[in-house]
Amino acid sequence: MIYTANSSPSTNLQWLSTLNTDDIPTKNYRKSSIIGTIGPNTNSAEMISKLRQAGLNIVRMNFSHGSYEYHQSVIENARESEQQFQGRPLAIALDTKGPEIRTGVTKDDKDWDVKAGHVMLFSTNPKYKDQCDDKIMYIDYTNIVKQIDIGKIIFVDDGVLSFKVLEKIDGETLKVETLNNGKISSRKGVNLPGTDVDLPALSEKDKADLKFGVEHGVDMIFASFVRTANDVQAIRDVLGEKGKGIQVISKIENQQGVNNFDEILKETDGVMVARGDLGIEIPAPQVFIAQKQLIAKCNLAGKPVICATQMLDSMTYNPRPTRAEVSDVGNAVLDGADCVMLSGETAKGTYPIESVKMMHETCLVAEKAIAYAPLFNEMRTLTVRPTETVETIAISAVSASFEQQARAIIVLSTSGTSARLCSKYRPNCPILMVTRNAQAARFSHLYRGVYPFIYHKARASNPAEWQHDVEERLKWGMDEAVALGILNKGDVVVAIQGWTGGLGHTNTLRVLECV
């Protein structure tokens, strides 16, 4: 259904009351992007192409695992797959390991049983690094004794084991009480909920990984455990001039990140609500609130936001998801997430293609439940004025798309900014971005509703040829959309462009007919 910004329904509740389970969404246009983690089961050009056909937009590499040779093979396979879909970009994301705390290695690398109520020691003394047992366990965070308070809880192995701090024995030793039965194993992750961790933003491994990403042309960084705006700047410093076009997406995974979110949002290019570690660092029911809060703030700022972790987790080993998982994906879309992410489902799962298809179908249905006109009016009302010229044009384009009942907004873009700002105001039609900037085309998959196309024909060499070049790009973009089934001949299209080439010149809006 298409409606104008001033027509009914005037509220979200009215729109929801008109939904019909018999309505089948179109299969050729999904606004939300899908991120898939590539693992051993999916690391081939053939498999990545199959995932793309199922709906994949962004390839994720998890640098907590795998060698540089392995990750290079993922990049090569992704680029080979991209070539099979001429003009349609595929983005590549590098997910950093980030600052993390781990236990040491147990004696003989065996598991040691512990019972609730058992009292033992945690030590930062390196002599216990490979001598852990049920009496003493090494922790590789030197400042843990200084930073943690008595009475605080320490989680080990994603919360499988929990301990309460009883006493600070000395500058490197804690006495703790085991709160549940379990096993002490080697090299398990440690979480300190409610404790400010002063680890450096980037380890030496992270710095090397970022430099690898720059050299191999990744499009975005998923930066783990971002706690302050300074963490984002530290990443940009490592990326340097050569990597200045790489988007930095800050993963919010602990209370510090939530507390400092406003300053992080100003500095970062986008955000990931990483619910796994976040659900350990803060009470699990509060993750629900954090997800809605962080997504809303990103929407208001016009910055892309990803919802991640366990979205279709049961599909790792089952052909169908639980109903709760489907609702989780759908509600993330309703919350305002630009992208949804698959982890183990595609990295190691038995049903990677089915997982992407299910994500695709769920997003399609969820997007029908959004009242776009009331949402646009709310976003426009909340916009701080005066706006920059490019944002004014974006607002006008989205407004015109409602009033003209347009089937698409087509954006001629250099940097992707105008497409991102159109996405901010959530039109109910696709945003077709035509650009010569391959990197901008790829990372524009982060923005909801944006369909990026890479235009390969050379730029006009003089101002006299500029308008002819504009008309050629508009016609080419519409032809590509017709070929994909997004547009039909005769459809109304809103077009925005610059008065000349280069960055920051977007100031022109037109209403066209697809011919």
UniProtKB/Swiss-Prot annotation:
GO process annotations (BP): glycolytic process
Organism: Yarrowia lipolytica (strain CLIB 122 / E 150)
Site feature Transition state stabilizer, where: K251
Keyword Nucleotide-binding: yes
Keyword Transferase: yes
Assembly description: Homotetramer.
Residues annotated to bind Mg(2+): E253, D277
InterPro entries assigned to the protein according to its UniProt record, in alphabetical order: Pyr_Knase, Pyrv/PenolPyrv_kinase-like_dom, Pyrv_kinase-like_dom_sf, Pyrv_Knase-like_insert_dom_sf, Pyrv_Knase_AS, Pyrv_Knase_brl, Pyrv_Knase_C, Pyrv_Knase_C_sf
Disulfide bridge partners, by residue number: none
UniProt EC number: 2.7.1.40
Binding-site residues, ATP: N62, F63, S64, H65, R102, K188
Family: Belongs to the pyruvate kinase family.
Cofactor: Mg(2+); K(+)
This protein's encoding gene: PYK1
Catalyzed chemical reaction(s): pyruvate + ATP = phosphoenolpyruvate + ADP + H(+)
Positions bound to substrate: R60, G276, D277, T309
Protein name: Pyruvate kinase
SUPFAM superfamilies xref list: Phosphoenolpyruvate/pyruvate domain, PK beta-barrel domain-like, PK C-terminal domain-like
Biological pathway: Carbohydrate degradation; glycolysis; pyruvate from D-glyceraldehyde 3-phosphate: step 5/5
Keyword field: ATP-binding, Glycolysis, Kinase, Magnesium, Metal-binding, Nucleotide-binding, Potassium, Pyruvate, Transferase
A GO term for molecular function: magnesium ion binding
Any Pfam family: PK_C
